Swiss-Prot record:
Keywords: Cytoplasm, Exonuclease, Hydrolase, Nuclease. Belongs to the XseB family. Signal peptide: none annotated. This is Exodeoxyribonuclease 7 small subunit. Heterooligomer composed of large and small subunits. Pfam families: Exonuc_VII_S. It comes from Zymomonas mobilis subsp. mobilis (strain ATCC 31821 / ZM4 / CP4). Bidirectionally degrades single-stranded DNA into large acid-insoluble oligonucleotides, which are then degraded further into small acid-soluble oligonucleotides. GO terms for molecular function: exodeoxyribonuclease VII activity. GO terms for biological process: DNA catabolic process.
Amino acid sequence: MSQEKNISELSFEEALKKLEEIVRRLESGDTTLEDSIQMYSQGDALKKQCEARLKAAQKKIEQISLDQDGRATGTSPFDAE
């Protein structure tokens, strides 16, 4: 099974944890150049996976619309911008 397939099967939390570990190892400076390049590549794939999971979750979020008295009147799609 390829690295890309493994990453795509990770939950957001698992991918984020792996990404944080890679960042920690890269920041420590205790890796070879080849290992650093490989970890950077894996980290980039993990970052993209996390972003994709967040965007998918954001599309599912709805905002509750309130009237002037504060009563719920319905929902509308979440707009982050």
